[in-house]
Amino acid sequence: MARHAIFQALPALLAFIQTASSTPLTFSTLYPRNDSQIVWPTEVSSLVHDKSWASFGEKTTRWSSYKSPTFDEVFLPETEEQLSLALEYMSGNNMTWLAKSGGHGYAPSLHAIQDAVLINLENFNYVKLQDDNTAVVGTGVRFSDLIDTVAAAGRELSAMLGGGLGRLQGLHGLTSDALRKVRLALWNGTIIEASNNVNPDLFWGIRGSGQNYGIVIESTYETWPATNGGKHYSADLVFTKDSVQRVMEITNELTAGGLDEKLAVLMFFALDATTSQITVIVNLVYSGPEEEGRKYTERFSSFSVDLQENMLGWEELPTKTVHGLIPQSCATGPRYNLRALNTKVLNPATWVSFTDAFETFLVANPLAAGSAMMIETFPVQGVKALADDYSAFPHRDHFENVIESIGSYTDDSVADAVNNFFAEWRDKFAEPSSSGYDKLYVYQNYANEDEPLSALYGYNEWRHERLTSLKNKFDPRGFFNGYHPVPSNVAGWS
């Protein structure tokens, strides 16, 4: 079986999201914007473009058009001084903005941002490897550029603001755990740093809820020597839907005592356009010798219909695993309606039922045939090695399997059907008898808008109090309320 005709759209990895927005709803009611008085400062006016600009669409298009924000102007700063000046000006005139790096930031709550200024940060596109083996990363860098630079130096990094899951988290923890400091622009243009030594309270909050406080301009990350000389064993296995129960049983066996810290498992469910049946691709990556990785592949290969094995460089994993189909998921423009949750186990009976229902749904709704389901089963040793209160990331004990459904379509006639189907199945997967957890836990970068905020940021009252305090301190007027906003009062958590 070659490249398959199955994935018309695949989920994005959402691996380096730095989104910040302004939706000062209460503030704008008190101090409404007066467009007749808006005249950009001369220092930045040449960097601001309206819809008549030929490149306006290119510079404002986002990965998903589902409940997306809209823009009247785009601002492309070249220096942090220009960014600072513009923020001071926009906040003073109560203008609404959204900051964009890669444009993969997904949250239906961004729909509240309409007729705004898009701050396109593509000019902050640099990676600098330091003598101490840290990487200084501009916020405009795409993750592919980052990993190429780091890998060329014989180093590696976990695959920030929402946490940062990745295949190497068993060895190195989350991407946000590798963060050492950031430079941040606040709502009024003030530029500050945050680290364990400077603004440590803000640094704590950035690592798990960072879209709420400002615009990250630059980040400094720790890197590590490349594992196994930079080579990773990868196996792509293809299964028909009648193998789903066995696939889940084996995966549960692998995770029961703790998944090998060097092993990562990804699964994709999608409709084969030729057979009109669900096909499942399982990708195994072992960050070690081929012979050790193959021991895990042999658990699955006897009942797979196709197997492809490779030794890949770390920098090749995002583009050459899963038959090289993942880059196609970065296509911009379609509606991508996501539902997600974390589970302790993968209940075989529930997944068999889902697979049958998913196939029936896609056949009945061909306009949504590009939809997919993804499961990321990554090791958690590095994640759990840090204390629960190490950062604002709340799921260190609830991160065995991260499930993400991606409803993909371009015709809104199927919007309600897609939304209802995946919301219903998210709730079924979240039932304790299926998930193995007593509550709903959701990785923030994959969240929709119908989950309780505690599912994203943690159920502990001390977390609510600490996050709300940070919100009031660093974003007192709610200019960064577009992306799963932290409440400005503790009562808002309920």
Regions found by a protein language model. Name each.
Residues A2-R3, L13, Q18-S494:
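Soluble FAD-dependent oxygen oxidases
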